[in-house]
Every structure is written in structure tokens, then in C-alpha cells.
Amino acid sequence: MCICINCNHITKCNTYHLIESQHKQPHLTRSPLFIPKYPVVHVNISNNCTYNQIDWDLVECLSFVEKPNSWNLDAN
């Protein structure tokens, strides 16, 4: 699971912006300026007979600052 959803920096993080792109999701920020320190992204590839699925998860980051529910912009 991507730890970004509970990070205070989610709306301005350029690594999360990349993950949004890989998941073909709308961006929280058009031009994120925050560059996290030492993010670790796991890329999981699942093969099915009819398609391949790729899941990108940021699992570790020295810049992580916990703020539960940060992804929910309506709650902030």
C-alpha cells in the first residue's frame, strides 16, 4: 500500500505526482515542487491471461510526515 495517502506532503510531492501518472489518475497538483528524500517505490506486476496489471506503491520515504487522511482533500 502506498504510504502517501497518509503523508502531509501528498499535495505537493513530485514522487506522488509520478505515481498518479502511472495509475492514470488525475493529479492533486499541476506542478508539485516538493522533492522527497529517498523515496522507495515498489512496482508490482501481475500477469493474467488477458492483461497485465502494474501497481506502483511508495513504501518508504525519509520525508514522510504522518497526517492521516491527507489524500481526502475535502477533509483538510
UniProtKB/Swiss-Prot annotation:
Protein name per the record: Uncharacterized protein ycf34
Subcellular location(s) of the protein: Plastid, Chloroplast
Main localization category: plastid
GO CC, alphabetical: chloroplast
Originating gene: ycf34
Superkingdom, natural source: Eukaryota
InterPro entries, sorted: Uncharacterised_Ycf34
Keyword entries, A-Z: Chloroplast, Plastid
